[in-house]
Amino acid sequence: MKASQFFISTLKEAPAEAALASHKLMIRAGLIKANASGLYTWMPMGLRVLRKVENVVREEMARAGSVELLMPVVQPAELWQESGRWEFYGKELLRLKDRHDRDFCMGPTCEEVIADIVRKEINSYKQLPKNFYHIQTKFRDEVRPRFGVMRAREFVMKDAYSFHADYASLQTTYDAMYDAYCRIFTRLGLAFRPVAADTGSIGGTGSHEFQVLAESGEDVIAYSDTSDYAANIELAPTLPLKGERTAAQAELTKVHTPNVKTIESLVEFLNIPVEQTLKSIVVESENEGEIVLLLLRGDHEFNDIKAEKLAGVKSPLTMASSAAIVEQFGANGGSLGPVGFKGKVYADFATEKGADWVIGANEDGYHYTGFNFGRDAAEPEFVDLRNVVEGDESPDGQGRLKLARGIEVGHVFQLRDKYTQAMNVSFLDNNGKSQIMEMGCYGIGITRVVAAAIEQNNDEKGIIWTKAMAPFEVVIVPMNYKKSDAVREAADKIYAELLAAGADVLLDDRDERAGVLLNDSELLGIPHRIVIGDRALKEGNVEYAERRNNEAQAVAIGEIVARVTASLNG
């Protein structure tokens, strides 16, 4: 492709609102153009990258036995009402009516649609298992779209759905799709980790995320420094502490702590280690009118996903109202504790072996020092309530945990019968008996993969594309293409020979200054660059550089095509 026939639109500066490197570089390189908050046009250069990702995904889906179809973006409300997600999904689900006043939505996922298709088309165990996928534009009405295409309202997803006669079959396909995802992200040249994860709003049982490692990632993953264990921090469990409880040394003492309502201010006011404090979180019970008290160390981060799964706790997790707290404790938040509380109390594992805690006294402006479980309040039930921290024992018992940030680009779920039961997706088994199908679902954020790749692969000059994702494999940058016959003839000859060799080549024949052409080639991140100028040609050479190391070297003009094709095929 010649640049004069293509479309290149680059910027020297990124817009002020762009925070992430990927957002800045995608705008500057002209990969995307913003139309509204969270809505983007994929320009020709960006679309080439998107298609490269899609091609790899399609190849690996076919290898895994998944069959492509295409489902609608606009979906009928009755399917979502049947599954129970019409109300559950909340305002992120964009609802609309047609001219006949019928309810529809812009689908963020397609579980309901594919379940409806399968229940109409498949009725026998002889037709199972089946695995379908599509690549489609989605819409999720994000309350605060940000970070460019990383968290946009409109995005491209690959969704796959599998249906099975039994769980063993589901597990086989789940493993095959897990392996396919590993191949996809490896082929795309990404540094990633598969991690155990929560199922979230999709539901089901088993689940793994595929996280691209990046400091800008919104997710935190925990992994063992010894074994293969890895999980999203939301799911990574903490373990009960070993050994005996520390003996109590202090008496329970009420101290005046005026205007002290946070752990930080408590630590400063009493001049104590934060590890000696307990914080109280009060949530609604599944029994109406009752509340549950949750206790964890002041320096630990509360994990609401774990708390929601506790017996007796209302789901979804709901914080108790101020009125309910005052009614039950006689004090406001910031001064709460278990002394005298008659309701259910859970305490985190990390508090079980400690002694002489500092905790709220259930009186505004007062705290207790020297609090001990069993002596000053009944022993609570000790459970896992917090996020893991670096240095915690790995849940598999091998090594210690480390933390890293990641960008979720893929997610696989064992849905089991969450949707098939609700929507009566059944089949006749070999005995002629009706059975509910097992179901799996498998997603990849195609547009997010592009942004995540840039987060991992960039420098001060621009993007550094991996081999599989680059919009072009080679860029030829001729100096004075319009004015120098020698440069033009050499550029056209090399361009033609590379095309004949099967390379994906961009010949930048724009009538621009040399500095603009060179800067754009680095900003666009095309892996291989050939610079052709009159001075080098007089010596029989061209300049060749790989974008990842930017080390330019002179190569004989008669050898450059073989040199580049060898690198491309290596």
UniProtKB/Swiss-Prot annotation:
One Pfam entry name: tRNA-synt_2b
GO BP of this protein: prolyl-tRNA aminoacylation
MF (Gene Ontology): aminoacyl-tRNA deacylase activity; ATP binding; proline-tRNA ligase activity
Record field: catalytic activity: tRNA(Pro) + L-proline + ATP = L-prolyl-tRNA(Pro) + AMP + diphosphate
EC number assigned by the record: 6.1.1.15
Keywords: Aminoacyl-tRNA synthetase, ATP-binding, Cytoplasm, Ligase, Nucleotide-binding, Protein biosynthesis
Subcellular location field: Cytoplasm
Protein origin, superkingdom: Bacteria
One GO CC term on file: cytosol
Major site of localization recorded for this protein: cytoplasm
Stored InterPro entries: aa-tRNA-synt_IIb, aa-tRNA-synth_II, aa-tRNA-synth_II/BPL/LPL, Anticodon-bd, Anticodon-bd_dom_sf, Pro-tRNA-ligase_IIa, Pro-tRNA-synth_IIa_bac-type, Pro-tRNA-Synthase_IIa_type1
UniProt note: domains: Consists of three domains: the N-terminal catalytic domain, the editing domain and the C-terminal anticodon-binding domain.
Function, as annotated: Catalyzes the attachment of proline to tRNA(Pro) in a two-step reaction: proline is first activated by ATP to form Pro-AMP and then transferred to the acceptor end of tRNA(Pro). As ProRS can inadvertently accommodate and process non-cognate amino acids such as alanine and cysteine, to avoid such errors it has two additional distinct editing activities against alanine. One activity is designated as 'pretransfer' editing and involves the tRNA(Pro)-independent hydrolysis of activated Ala-AMP.
Subunit structure: Homodimer.
Family stated for the protein in its record: Belongs to the class-II aminoacyl-tRNA synthetase family. ProS type 1 subfamily.
NCBIfam families: PRK09194.1, proS_fam_II
This protein's name: Proline--tRNA ligase
Organism: Neisseria meningitidis serogroup C / serotype 2a (strain ATCC 700532 / DSM 15464 / FAM18)
Lineage: Bacteria, Pseudomonadati, Pseudomonadota, Betaproteobacteria, Neisseriales
